[in-house]
Amino acid sequence: MVGNIIPFIGGEEEKSEKEPLRIWGHIDEEKGEIVPATSPVITCQCVRVPVLDGHTAAVFVKFKKKPTKEQLIEKLLAFEGAPQKLNLPSAPKQFIQYLEEDNRPQVKLDVDYENGMGVSVGRIREDSVYDFKFIGLAHNTVRGAAGGAVLCAELLKAQGFITKK
């Protein structure tokens, strides 16, 4: 597959568009089911590129109130989720790093940021249709699968959902 790009990954685009809305949704207590959020609007196109590890995304965002580029970068760098606030063992200390070089993030250089548990963002620039566009990079097996599962377990334990019998 070296030297080739596959322009379709079955089921990946639908999953990428719907799964975040389920995560950002809420649980209907009466029905006992997840009600997905209705915003933001997410659309994507997935392409398989031959790299060992890492998912790279071209992201386009529009805000209700457009921030400056500097404000956007400041908010990304300041982001702190429950895993950081609880200082969980697997949690990256700095969840998002912003790389100023115009040729970053790169899989070879940046996929292992924060032991693979962090997200690298670069090339933030204004867009003619949306407010901004940027490139994001995350480790698909560390952050996205194995490490993500460990971090979820740590969070559930810290929040009291997992206890000893």
Q: Which role does the model predict for each range below?
A:
Residues 22, 48, 69, 93, ...:
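Arginine residue identity/basic-tract feature
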Residues 66-110:
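Terminal hydrophobic/aromatic helix or amphipathic segment near a protein terminus
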Residues 1-3, 38-40, 92, 115-118, ...:
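Generic structural motif recognizing short loop/turn segments at the entrances and edges of beta-strands
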Residues 1-80:
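Active-site-lining helix/loop region of Rossmann-like oxidoreductase modules
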Residues 31-38, 84-92, 163-165:
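Flexible, glycine/charged-enriched surface loops at secondary-structure junctions
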Residues 83-84, 100-165:
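C-terminal helical cap and adjacent loop that interface with cofactors, partners, or active-site loops
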